[in-house]
Amino acid sequence: TDPMWTADGKYLLFRSSSRGNDKEVESTLPNGEKRKWTPTQIYFIEMATGKIIQATEGPNLGSAFLANKTNRMFVSRKEKENWNMYVMDLDKFFADVKQGKIGKPSAYETFIGTFPTEMGRPGGYAVDCNDDYAYITVEREGTEEEKERMMKNAFLPESNQPVKIKPTLCGIRKMNLSTGEVTKVIDTEFKTGHIQASRFTPGEIVFCNETGGDAHQRMWFCTADGTVFKPLYKETPLDWVTHETFATKDFVYFNVLGFQPRLRKQASGIVRINLRTDDVELIGQVELEKDRQAIDGQLVGRGFWHCNASRDNKWAAGDTFGGNVWLINVQTGERHWLVSDTKMKPDHAHPSFSPDGTKVLFQSGHFTNGKRLNLMMVDISSFK
């Protein structure tokens, strides 16, 4: 859902914790729990050659986000007790790579600012289409009245639905990427996640009520000035919404799951909502007849799981619980079965499109029997 190609289209970004030589480190969570982990680093694939280039190092990398208009990358780092934002000059970095003289990160990174602790505990972020603001999710303390209201309104799942993430008072803040100044956008009374900014219209933000499973209202929309804050696609009790993606200028694509028998009593599949009119359109569903007799809880077959769309609204793509990747012509409804048996582990296929809409990119554990992921790409330029 975030930009993966550099602005000039010459490099593709991915993350990995297994390609480098980083040693396992231990950190302490806010609740005092100890956690061991191997640091994740950012890598780029040069599209013309297939060469893989490591772009970050060290144990303190947070999130990275490619700029929309120039070859830059915004990088957050946890340094001591501070959450710091930097911007990396990728043109300078790639030029040095070609000359075989890569410097330290400090040679390419410029400090932007430190997130103020009084504004909350920062998490994920997205960058506005003009590259001038980062919209950052936060957890916050709030008031006792807010906490009481949050618990009263918290989602109560069916017996076979997980709630892996407990409700938390949260919000969205914005950082000026020129000055480092941080200001409030909105406060929420649910765990706020999966934040995305429009790549086309400044100040439009989509985010979710993150439970790790179903929610009574998953998708939300707000503007960067905080004047608009509303549900996006008002759900019914049988809607299990997931994997929203701010794919195009006027449409947010998402999935309504159909993998449980009770969820099949109404339409499911890849859906899109028009941000200007709130009109909703079902794009398509597949594989619901597969494994109908499977043991309840088996995630095999049973329709789409994740989705994305090309920027011109011509194509939608989705992966299924069975590990297949499908392509749908949004205008005609014609479906193409692109890929089989991605294993959906150690992570899901998560198909997405190149900026020009001619290629579908996805992850696959097929060639490692689900032990490691390969990045795969299918050229769809000949598809009608």
Task: For every predicted segment, state its role.
Residues 348-384:
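Blade-level signature of beta-propeller repeat domains, shared across WD40, Kelch, NHL, RCC1
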Residues 16-37, 78, 84-90, 95, ...:
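Short, conserved, GDST-rich strand-edge loop motifs in beta-rich repeat architectures
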Residues 1, 35, 43-60, 90-120, ...:
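Multi-bladed beta-propeller domains
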Residues 182-222, 226-228:
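Loop-centered beta-sheet repeat module
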Residues 2-15, 58-77, 113-134, 139, ...:
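Conserved beta-propeller blade repeats
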Residues 41-43, 84-86, 171-173, 218-220, ...:
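A short loop-to-beta-strand structural motif that recurs across blades of beta-propeller domains
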Residues 57-170, 184-187:
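Asp-box/WD-like beta-propeller blade repeats and closely related beta-sheet repeat scaffolds
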